[in-house]
Amino acid sequence: MYTCNITGKKFNLEAGEKNREGGLAFGYNCRFRAVTFLLTKMLYHNVEILSKILINKDIKGLGMSDSAWSVLCEEKYDYVNTFHNFEPKLDIYDEHDVKKFNNLDFIISSDVFQFLLPYPDIQIAFNNLYKMLKPNGFIVFSVPFVYGDHQEYYPNLYDYKIVNHDDENLLVNTTKNGEYEVFNNLKFSGGDDIKLEMRMFTKSSLIQYLSDADFIDIEFHEPDEDMNKFGIFWDNICSLIITARK
């Protein structure tokens, strides 16, 4: 039996469920539990059950992705879960949006940055995460990543649309320089909110982006025995949850 570190309830997992996107219990999978595990550990220097934490509205946080547990975070903290296209809105490339959120204790961004457009520059998104934090504030961050070479699938994406031709989705792009491009074999993911994947990060590229944004204490957290107790398992060492401080 495992204890859900979000709800505090007990649950079982089958062997085949013990992976990043598996292990669903009470609406939360292994990735969600891992994010919450690290959030409480970073805040309290100890692992806490999110539902049982005392309310503290002096702690200010922001979510870019985590509607699955945003209700609990909003209950416990001065916390807002943002969206890209509607209020409360945060376009991480938009300086006006970024200025609305500042002096944050923490930001949660889980599996978002692989969908961000390459224009104007993905580095700007990492820089803006840093800007929104207070000194010593931190991020709990994840994206799919591998070991090897970073891949930008559409590096010159600028003015594009997706069309269907002969039952195949094609991306038709006009670059900033006016050149015409067509791509097939598009990669979509995102669960209920299907989006086009723009890139595949690597561990080294993530370290570079975070370091260039001036983050420190960058850590990639491979599930250990303490995490296993809460039903947190990975099936490989790719796409781990990351924490980093300002």
What are these regions (language model features)?
Residues P120-K134, F138-R245:
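S-adenosyl-L-methionine-dependent methyltransferase catalytic module, highlighting the catalytic core
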Residues E48-K52, I108-D111, F188, Q208-A213:
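A generic short-segment signal for beta-strand/edge and adjacent turn/coil regions
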